[in-house]
């Protein structure tokens, strides 16, 4: 496995292009955009802004969030998905509401599948739920789940450990960085960040990524 550093503006630009496809080409307008916190927040905000402008003469698209977690750190995955809450409870959804569920990555797929199952339990139709991610990992070594992304910016096909990657989203992630990675991707671009971040990471950070 290798680590990829994905710039925030790449995610932003890709999200705008994907929003244009969904709206202008496919005619999909959600009633509710749910961002899966934390990872989906940046991309969901960009998509929401697109709809605010493109769909401004029609009913507003509600922006909401759900707090769900299955990852504990960069190398460990919990055995289950925890859903801490929704800012717009699924109980408030009406039959026929169109829902967009946004996350940064579909990796194991456990989080997305758990959230879609909850929405289905509240009577939503699967065809009215669109799963949107920046990165869709299709890993042949894993069991295929019932829910996969409807829209994605990149599809990453993984058949071997060497083909796998850990994607570091520079829009919102700091945990798990080595001293060398901090220097290359942060301090070299803005020297003041060294003064701010180095004390937080300490002197004992691993020098190698």
Q: What is the predicted function of each stretch?
A:
Residues 117-209:
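PRPP-dependent phosphoribosyltransferase catalytic core
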Residues 27-37:
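Short glycine-rich phosphate-binding loop at a beta-alpha junction
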Residues 25-29, 91-95, 124-125:
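Glycine-rich phosphate-binding loop signature in dinucleotide/nucleotide-binding domains
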């Amino acid at each position: 496995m290798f680590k990829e550093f994905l710039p925030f503006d790449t995610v932003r630009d890709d999200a705008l292009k994907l929003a244009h496809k969904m709206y202008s080409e496919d005619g999909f307008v959600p009633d509710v955009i749910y961002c899966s916190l934390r990872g989906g927040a940046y991309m969901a905000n960009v998509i929401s802004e697109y709809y605010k402008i493109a769909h401004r003469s029609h009913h507003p698209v509600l922006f909401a969030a759900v707090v769900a977690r299955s990852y504990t750190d960069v190398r460990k995955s919990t055995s289950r998905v925890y859903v801490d809450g929704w800012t717009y409870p699924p109980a408030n959804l009406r039959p026929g509401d169109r829902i967009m569920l946004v996350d940064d990555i579909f990796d194991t797929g456990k989080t997305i599948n758990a959230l879609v199952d909850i929405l289905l339990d509240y009577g939503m139709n699967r065809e009215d739920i669109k799963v949107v991610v920046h990165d869709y990992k299709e890993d042949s070594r894993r069991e295929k789940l019932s829910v996969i992304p409807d829209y994605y910016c990149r599809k990453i096909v993984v058949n071997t450990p060497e083909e796998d990657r850990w994607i570091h989203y520079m829009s919102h992630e700091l945990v798990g960085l080595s001293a060398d990675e901090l220097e290359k991707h942060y301090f070299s671009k803005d020297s003041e960040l060294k003064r701010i971040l180095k004390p937080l990471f300490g002197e004992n950070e691993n020098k190698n990524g």
